[in-house]
Amino acid sequence: MKFIIKLFPEITIKSQSVRLRFIKILTGNIRNVLKHYDETLAVVRHWDNIEVRAKDENQRLAIRDALTRIPGIHHILEVEDVPFTDMHDIFEKALAQYREQLEGKTFCVRVKRRGKHEFSSIEVERYVGGGLNQHIESARVKLTNPDVTVHLEVEDDRLLLIKGRYEGIGGFPIGTQEDVLSLISGGFDSGVSSYMLMRRGCRVHYCFFNLGGAAHEIGVRQVAHYLWNRFGSSHRVRFVAINFEPVVGEILEKVDDGQMGVVLKRMMVRAASKVAERYGVQALVTGEALGQVSSQTLTNLRLIDNVSDTLILRPLISYDKEHIINLARQIGTEDFARTMPEYCGVISKSPTVKAIKAKIEAEEENFDFSILDKVVEEANNVDIREIAQQTQQEVVEVETVSGFGANDVILDIRSVDEQDDKPLKVEGVDVVSLPFYKLSTKFGDLDQSKTWLLWCERGVMSRLQALYLREQGFANVKVYRP
């Protein structure tokens, strides 16, 4: 079998040296991706296309599908490569190939020709088109918007009968631009923004700020691995996970409610910049869109950018949510994003949309930056290729209950402000307050002879924190959902 890879048009308008470099990199990327399907596969680069030849017919569909997801490819032609003698021979071969496909349809013939011949491309189109029209009674020529377009390519003494054309994702080959670090949360925005930078030729590494235990991290790892495996598997990348619960806890205790969102984002950018510097990455990527939430106003984005010299790229800055969700659906991350948890207790009740620099800096003076340094130092860095095995581990299930027994105590894990605003009172059972960000250090001090029923507003944080406690060896935890 044979495939002809057509280059993304922006590659073809580059200078000769740049174009050759891009084609060379794309050829290497194709080899890296396809070697898993057929080790005997041949990839040959030319000035205006790349040729892929494979022997294992059983892998035809898999190879074709993989090619449509490699950045830098405009479209793929699946072809049958045969010799020919003259125009009539071209017609006979086209008739044998396309007869069934053209019956009862309108059609036109389009020919591309390279090399020296006694005929022009238009002459071949007329000759073959006329012959097909005469020999297939139910077919009819229609030059504008036909049902079927018969594509032929003539190169020297070879005829390429095009059996199918398949669109690629375009863009630049990965590796033609410098590395970036994507701040990935597993939601719609960060997945799409990561894809957009891969499509633009960047090797995308991933940085995840864990706010909710193993279950959330496993979910985000699956998203990152999916994106890499589907669009960027030609290159090795890193997945860096930072336990940000201590930072969130410090913010909730030390920072004014209205400033929390901007301060949290500033802390994330500081941490990600340290990771980027450690690995020689040139830019950060976020999924922020202008005005989508309170921290994404121009004033707040400028204050967030100010904490780091690292370039921050925001490919979705002008996109609306519907457009982002449509893109997520196209690339296959929509289902991941819809099931990714959101966290109660991490969001300000009355966030500022126009933060003042002096006020933000004053709030941050109360923050213990050694906590930030520590979580960055302890960040977990893995090769994304290892995630496939790691994410197969089963997360321990935690029982969810709607009632309670004599030995049960409800543990309200909301933030202090939320507890003050809406105190939880349940008749017939004790309620103890312990904010979620203190569970890792304070839960062991509680009476372990009791069964603790974790509760929060949405039920997401309580489940994730219960999973975390179970992982730490505490079997006396359940989730309370009345």
From Swiss-Prot:
Domain named Rhodanese: residues: 404-482
Gene Ontology CC: cytosol
EC number per UniProt: 2.8.1.4
Binding positions (ATP): 183-184, 265, 287, 296
Subcellular location: Cytoplasm
Disulfide pattern: 344-456
GO terms, molecular function: ATP binding; CCA tRNA nucleotidyltransferase activity; tRNA binding; tRNA-uracil-4 sulfurtransferase activity
Highest taxon, organism lineage: Bacteria
Pathway: Cofactor biosynthesis; thiamine diphosphate biosynthesis
Single GO BP term: tRNA 4-thiouridine biosynthesis
Keywords, comma-separated and alphabetical: ATP-binding, Cytoplasm, Disulfide bond, Nucleotide-binding, Redox-active center, RNA-binding, Thiamine biosynthesis, Transferase, tRNA-binding
Annotated catalytic residues: 456
Entry's family note: Belongs to the ThiI family.
The protein, known as: tRNA sulfurtransferase
